[in-house]
Regions:
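Electropositive polyanion-binding surfaces
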Residues: 1-248
Length: 248
């Protein structure tokens, strides 16, 4: 199952919260601080927080466990109990490809709850690699992650986290390699959800917010629209923006 926060259950069209979201359009991120698209109390109420039963739009995908062929899917609006929040910055060094694929390999300090979820994470990693490989066939060439991402962090006094920076903070820059197992699992889950929901809305004649790209030829840019069209860069028949309702 893929579970997405559902703030739209409470945000009514034309309401002050709806107006604020329409004015801001997206959350603004900067090192050590962010300006959220929605008011913080709305974000905190609807974020998928560990230890709570949270409103969610859920995509359930039924597949053949041996071949990983997708057989069917179902979308539900429900409350989902959130058991754990697994965070990249805490677990990328633990949830490695070797840890996921070699059952005999053990870290000296395995992190909980990741160690308790090793079997499930290993399957999700196998599924993510299969989904990526199938997209690359449609795409016509493999995706490469040869350029790293950079994390920016402000060194701040205790108690200052989450407050607006003052300008004198020390900035720490670290490298985070794209395509790490957790990164790949999340990315492929989001692509699967956005492409599945995009195709479903198109079948029903419901407009959505789509990203599309006609081809990978030089100069062909990604476009936004309200109709489902192929996205050559991702390798899917349609790609709707559906998985970041608290951010944009």
């Amino acid at each position: 199952g893929i579970h997405i926060a559902a703030p739209g259950l409470a945000v009514q069209p034309g309401s002050p919260v709806d107006g604020l979201g329409r004015a801001r359009l997206s959350t603004v991120y900067m090192p050590g601080y962010k300006v959220t698209m929605l008011p913080d109390d709305v974000v905190q109420t609807y974020t998928l927080q560990e230890g709570r039963d949270c409103p969610s739009v859920s995509l359930y995908v039924m597949l053949d466990e041996a071949t990983l062929e997708i057989k069917s899917s179902e979308t539900r609006l429900e409350r989902v109990p959130i058991a754990h929040n697994l965070r990249h910055d805490q677990l990328d060094a633990v949830v490695t490809e070797q840890w996921l694929t070699d059952t005999a390999f053990e870290h000296q300090n395995d992190s909980q709850p990741a160690s308790a979820l090793r079997e499930q994470l290993s399957f999700l990693y196998r599924l993510a690699k299969d989904l990526k490989a199938k997209r690359e066939v449609v795409r016509g060439k493999p995706e490469t992650f040869n350029r790293p991402d950079y994390n920016f962090r402000l060194v701040r006094e205790a108690g200052a986290q989450g407050t607006e920076p003052q300008g004198q903070e020390e900035v720490q820059i670290s490298i985070r390699q794209r395509g790490a197992p957790l990164d790949l699992i999340v990315a492929e889950a989001m692509i699967l959800a956005n492409s599945t929901w995009g195709s479903w809305m198109a079948e029903l004649g419901v407009p959505g917010i789509y990203r599309s790209q006609a081809s990978l030829a030089p100069g062909v840019k990604v476009r936004m629209g309200t109709k489902a069209l192929p996205h050559a860069g991702i390798g899917v028949k349609s790609y709707a923006w559906s998985t970041s309702p608290l951010r944009r």
